[in-house]
From Swiss-Prot:
Keywords: ATP-binding, Cytoplasm, Kinase, Nucleotide-binding, Transferase. The lineage of its organism: Bacteria, Pseudomonadati, Pseudomonadota, Alphaproteobacteria, Rhodospirillales. Gene3D superfamilies: Guanylate Kinase phosphate binding domain, P-loop containing nucleotide triphosphate hydrolases. It comes from Paramagnetospirillum magneticum (strain ATCC 700264 / AMB-1) (Magnetospirillum magneticum). GO terms for cellular component: cytosol. Pfam families: Guanylate_kin. This is Guanylate kinase. Essential for recycling GMP and indirectly, cGMP. Its EC number is 2.7.4.8.
């Protein structure tokens, strides 16, 4: 057996967080980004104009409508959608580069985007759906934010039912009763998924060397 064993590295993963508005996915996502240096937020491409202070390549990849359609035709997006008069999408290239480096990418997207990503990159995808403990609590949280009108809250509540119907399409479900416990649950999911053998690059050669080169 040689003194030097082959290096085992890890391929990164794509962590998708989805939930109805007010269930807590954004708060959980922010906590993950603050506490875990091995994961970063995905950067979307968009056709909308940059807002004051936004930096191209950091906040968004700003592209023309023509360029966006060209990228769609070339299948360069993991997922894409039209939102009102603008287009948004997740470029495949930058994400693949991050995954190869062993870092993870966090996505805050809805069930439709998750379906597209499952079709385009299932092996790298880990999806988590965050549920509220009750409909009453969901409405209380929405109203507690004090940033939406009664009409907007009603629309969000009406949309929540459809969004929650897609829970069986996700790998993991977290019922957000206690925020700290929910954050810990997602951290545990990440820890386990990172150790899956299919994400360990170089593992077969490593084990072969351990067994004496058989």
């Amino acid at each position: 057996m040689t003194d030097t064993l082959p290096t085992v590295s890890r391929r990164g993963l794509m962590l998708v967080m989805s939930s109805p508005s007010g269930a807590g996915k954004t708060t959980i996502s922010r906590a993950l980004l603050e506490r875990d240096p091995a994961i970063g937020m995905s950067v979307s491409a968009t056709t909308r104009a940059p807002r004051p202070g936004e930096v191209d390549g950091k906040d968004y990849h700003f592209v023309t409508v023509e360029k966006f359609h060209e990228m769609v035709e070339k299948r360069e997006f993991l997922e894409h959608a039209r939102v009102f008069d603008n287009f948004y999408g997740t470029p495949r290239g930058p994400v693949d580069e991050i995954l190869r480096s062993g870092r993870d990418v966090l996505f805050d997207i809805d069930w439709q985007g998750t379906q597209q990503m499952a079709q385009n990159a299932r092996a790298d995808l880990v999806s988590v759906f965050v549920l509220p403990p009750s409909v009453e609590e969901l409405e209380r949280r929405l109203r507690g934010r004090a940033q939406d009108s009664d009409e907007v809250v009603r629309k969000r509540m009406a949309k929540a039912g459809d969004e929650m119907s897609h829970w069986p399409e996700y790998d993991y479900i977290v019922v957000n009763i206690d925020l700290d416990k929910s954050i810990a649950a997602v951290q545990a999911i990440l820890a386990a998924e990172r150790l899956k053998r299919e994400r360990q690059v170089g593992l077969p050669d490593f084990v072969t060397q351990l067994r004496g080169g058989e």
